[in-house]
């Protein structure tokens, strides 16, 4: 019996260890105060845009303008014209100043569960002013006000090669004209044109599919009499550190793939990059054939992806003075002969990290290992198959909550051979209990002799006392992998289950504090000290399921162990109340299946757990009555 209790205690201790590690390593970091973005002076046409990114430094001359200087100049995009973007997934505008994509909303996702809440805004212009697309109806007051958000945008251009006048290439502040297309959408490309007046005509064509992928084609037509050399580039720029989850388990920051090698830099790590000549704090990686680079958030991402097979330089950099985080894709210099045209094509992903969509882009147009942009974590070898199985079950069932329950059954089925072996071993241990008691009486206080004879007994009866530990140990990586799936995959964001559970990626919103909504006051919100004591329904069910699982075995005789058993379910009930409801649902289902399995298998081997007897024996009133009865009998 002591071995059975030891296994249960091991399960509890390992689970507590999981919680302890979580609280130490995965706790949110304090969010630093937001830094104000410096404001700005008008620059001439081929100069770095105000408040915009520094021009790429991979210029043959080896010089890169300071980001601080760029951020200190005014933003011409505030007064430039705009072209509308409209699809079933995206809405926004392109600024003719630099041709930057700096105004983008995800129309399939809202900020909150409230259907009246605004769409998720992914990209924002440098100037927080009215944005009115050309050709679109004028809203009251002359336009639609954008929500206040730190500037975040994509911009393309050309860098002059050695000997080329920088004024002859379009930069982030160049004002383009629309050559064709009134609105960008699926099957509706838009082409912008800029003539440098010296014999070179630059064009930029934007195409958009029905999801989140832009195709950007830059051309350089040389109508002059001499060869012209320049290097195309793409930039993603974020002004100031964005609001992040700050969880150790989640990567937020620069992300990329460079010839099969994953590149990840958190925002705080980007500020600590080694300074490079002409660059500032930066990291440059030469990509020979396939790669991409961008920024990733928990659910959203922007990525620059040159055409497959295209060599380029992947750059992650930071400008301390302007507080701008930047990723770049710098293509090689092109020398265009008179009468010829140079072309550079690349892709821009700007949207939600939906597995099906990203996996589709990995196939067509062939963005290398694009699914690795989803943060699968340390246990990726478990996280990926668990997610795919959950995704398939969701497609079959149509409800993510029931899919999690079905997934739990499948996982328990996979580990059933080990669980069965464990429960059979526990039943055999019960059979050996009388012999172990006899050994204990015979050996007295000689612990070494007792252990030796017990091990000989196990060997003789072919019993493995450690068999019960294996299923428990196996649960730990499964738990972390499933947590990763629930925490980082957008498929669970705002996914409902039943009744009041409308978001399986968020904690259960019910609360014992107001009798689950029956009393006319609100429960303490997250961040409040009292929030830990609100006790949602799922947390209570978890505590009850853990308590019932304990009662399959008699309480240990050791007082310390008995106290651990008594408190552990209720401690976990409070600890896990703030976890994602999908994860708590998994744990409740897992405990319930474990109870049924253990009761059934042990009963089949002649040792049915005395569930109600164990409950009665653990009650203090019964223990006291037994003590009094014993005292009377002694008299």
From Swiss-Prot:
Gene3D superfamilies: 2.70.98.90
Primary site of residence: membrane
A Gene Ontology BP annotation from the UniProt entry: protein insertion into membrane
InterPro entries per record: Membr_insert_YidC, Membr_insert_YidC_N, YidC/ALB3/OXA1/COX18, YidC/Oxa/ALB_C, YidC_ALB_C, YidC_periplasmic_sf
Membrane topology of this protein: Multi-pass membrane protein
A GO term, aspect molecular function: membrane insertase activity
GO cellular component terms attached to this protein's record: plasma membrane
Regions crossing the membrane: 8-28, 396-416, 470-490, 528-548, 564-584
Keyword terms: Cell inner membrane, Cell membrane, Chaperone, Membrane, Protein transport, Transmembrane, Transmembrane helix, Transport
Chain spans, region Disordered: 33-61, 615-635
Basic and acidic residues composition-biased segments: 624-635
Places the protein is found: Cell inner membrane
Function recorded in the entry: Required for the insertion and/or proper folding and/or complex formation of integral membrane proteins into the membrane. Involved in integration of membrane proteins that insert both dependently and independently of the Sec translocase complex, as well as at least some lipoproteins. Aids folding of multispanning membrane proteins.
Family named by the database record: Belongs to the OXA1/ALB3/YidC family. Type 1 subfamily.
Subunit structure and binding partners: Interacts with the Sec translocase complex via SecD. Specifically interacts with transmembrane segments of nascent integral membrane proteins during membrane integration.
Protein's name according to its UniProt entry: Membrane protein insertase YidC
Gene of this entry: yidC
């Amino acid at each position: 019996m002591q071995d059975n209790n030891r296994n249960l205690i091991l399960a509890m201790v390992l689970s507590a260890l999981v919680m302890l590690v979580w609280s130490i390593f995965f706790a949110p970091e304090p969010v630093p105060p937001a830094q104000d973005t410096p404001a700005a002076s008008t620059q001439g046409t081929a100069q770095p845009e105000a408040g915009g990114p520094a021009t790429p430094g991979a210029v043959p001359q080896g010089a890169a303008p300071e980001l601080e200087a760029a951020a200190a100049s005014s933003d011409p995009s505030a007064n430039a014209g705009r072209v509308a973007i409209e699809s079933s997934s995206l809405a926004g505008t392109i600024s003719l100043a630099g041709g930057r994509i700096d105004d983008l909303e995800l129309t399939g996702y809202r900020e909150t569960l409230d259907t009246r809440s605004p769409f998720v805004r992914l990209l924002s212009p440098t100037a927080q002013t009215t944005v009115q697309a050309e050709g679109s109806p004028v809203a009251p007051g002359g336009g639609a006000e954008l929500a206040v958000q730190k500037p975040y945008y994509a911009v393309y251009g050309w860098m002059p090669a050695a000997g080329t006048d920088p004024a002859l290439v379009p930069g982030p502040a160049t004002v383009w004209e629309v050559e064709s297309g009134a609105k960008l959408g699926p099957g509706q490309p838009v082409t912008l044109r800029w003539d440098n007046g010296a014999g070179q005509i630059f064009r930029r064509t934007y195409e958009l599919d029905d999801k989140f992928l832009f195709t950007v084609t830059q051309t350089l037509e040389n109508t002059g009499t001499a060869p012209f050399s320049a290097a195309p580039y793409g930039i993603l720029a974020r002004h100031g550190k964005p609001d992040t989850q700050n969880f150790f388990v989640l990567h937020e920051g620069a992300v990329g793939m460079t010839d099969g090698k994953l590149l990840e830099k958190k925002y705080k790590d980007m500020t600590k990059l080694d300074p490079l000549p002409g660059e500032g704090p930066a990291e440059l990686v030469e990509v020979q054939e396939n790669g991409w680079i961008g920024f990733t958030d928990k659910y959203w991402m922007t990525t620059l992806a040159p055409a497959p097979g295209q060599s380029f330089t992947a750059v992650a950099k930071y400008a301390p003075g302007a507080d701008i985080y930047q990723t770049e894709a710098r293509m090689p210099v092109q020398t265009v002969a008179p009468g010829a045209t140079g072309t550079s094509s690349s892709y821009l992903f700007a949207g939600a990290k939906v597995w099906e969509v990203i996996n589709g882009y990995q196939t067509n147009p062939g963005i290398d290992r694009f699914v690795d942009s989803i943060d699968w974590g340390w246990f990726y070898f478990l996280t990926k198959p668990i997610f795919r199985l959950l995704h398939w079950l969701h497609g079959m069932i149509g409800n993510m909550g029931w899919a999690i329950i079905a997934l739990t059954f499948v996982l328990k089925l996979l580990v059933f051979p080990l669980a069965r072996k464990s429960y059979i071993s526990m039943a055999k241990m019960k059979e050996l209990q009388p012999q172990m008691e006899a050994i204990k009486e015979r050996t007295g206080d000689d612990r070494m002799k007792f252990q030796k004879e017990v091990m000989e007994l196990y060997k003789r009866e072919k019993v493995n006392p450690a068999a019960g530990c294996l299923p428990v140990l196996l649960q730990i990586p499964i738990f972390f992998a499933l947590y990763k799936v629930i925490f980082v995959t957008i498929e669970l964001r705002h996914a409902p289950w039943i009744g009041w559970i409308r978001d399986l990626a968020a904690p259960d919103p019910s609360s014992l504090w107001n009798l689950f909504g029956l009393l006319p006051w609100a429960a303490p919100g997250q961040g409040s000290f009292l929030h830990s004591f609100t006790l949602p329904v799922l947390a209570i069910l978890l505590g009850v399921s853990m308590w019932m699982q304990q009662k399959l075995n008699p309480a240990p005789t050791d007082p310390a162990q008995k106290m651990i058993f008594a408190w552990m379910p209720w401690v976990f009930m409070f600890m896990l109340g703030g976890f994602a409801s999908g994860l708590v649902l998994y744990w409740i289902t897992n405990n319930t299946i474990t109870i049924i399995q253990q009761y059934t298998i042990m009963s089949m081997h002649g040792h049915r757990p005395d569930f109600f007897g164990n409950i009665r024996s653990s009650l203090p009133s019964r223990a006291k009555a037994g003590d009094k009865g014993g005292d009377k009998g002694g008299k």
